[in-house]
């Protein structure tokens, strides 16, 4: 199972970024008519903060926009709004088939209005969701050139820069973003960049600011609070993590990210059956790959290999669906295969391809672990060192580094990495936490 690190969750749907990345507040070019102005305001209020969620659903918004377009097929603003609504629907359901609908709506908007800032930015967000980070960066830069004073594009640009390993540039982008508009979207991204650089306290502080800046009942606030809970989990603070997950569920009883988080808390506490119940609930609502993998790992840990294999087969089916809708799953599947001893030689090739497309610390870690699993420990160590270059307090990456050092016979380094991994979070992985402890005992 992957660690509950902020990145892995932020990134599995940086498996995503549209399924899981924040839909930021976007400023529209308002038309002179009051009717159009009202329509744009309504759409942005809904899509940005979900503050109108108590009065309307995404389906209602989509239906309304489709009806407008039937009577006025040249209405580029409605096409742009519809594209954003489809992105939100993908976020709510985890259904990647909405990506093609998003692309079609946004491309129609751009065909009618080639310099539409919002549609360009949203095209970038769609590219992020599909893990085409170079394209996302290109779309974001195009949008920024049109209007450098609006913030939506900066979020797209920063997310792409992070996934492309351009961390210094991402810091500069986010500083500009927060200077222009200090809000939930910029705060949460700054939290993430702090986490990547090993400043966990600073990440927690900024994520709390992001939570406090949100509308209490908004889905976006639920998402950010769940990220706050994940940060607490990643440092081994199960009580605070559970508190934040439960606060999320008070306003959103079926919020899958919080349900899955509680499942991991229960797993860490040794309550496997309750953990399975929570993750089963999450998978039933939204079969996201990370939920399905975690559930399979729990079944495996409980000795129910048949149920585990059923979940792992589902991962393969989900991969097929994602790829059919333009989502690059190379890195995620490489990690999954390496963790579960599947097609190891092919997995190395997949991990190399993933790293070439997204040369981030996460891509380096995936390649290191794939190489480890075929016994190429020296090359694995090179990429593992790269994965740790920012000082990220990620127990799984440290575990990988420790096991690589162990196989290379460097006992002191192996012990140091494994001790640090367990000191940060002794519950970091269902698959590997106990193995880390056993290996430390051998080293002692």
Name what the model sees in each region.
Residues 2-118, 138, 426-427, 433-444:
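N-terminal leader/linker segments that initiate helical-solenoid repeat arrays
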Residues 73, 114, 148, 181-182, ...:
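Short coil turns that delineate tetratricopeptide repeat
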Residues 77, 84, 118, 152, ...:
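Start-of-helix register in tetratricopeptide repeats
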Residues 81, 122, 156, 189, ...:
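Canonical tetratricopeptide repeat
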Residues 84, 91, 125, 159, ...:
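Residue-level recognition of tetratricopeptide repeat
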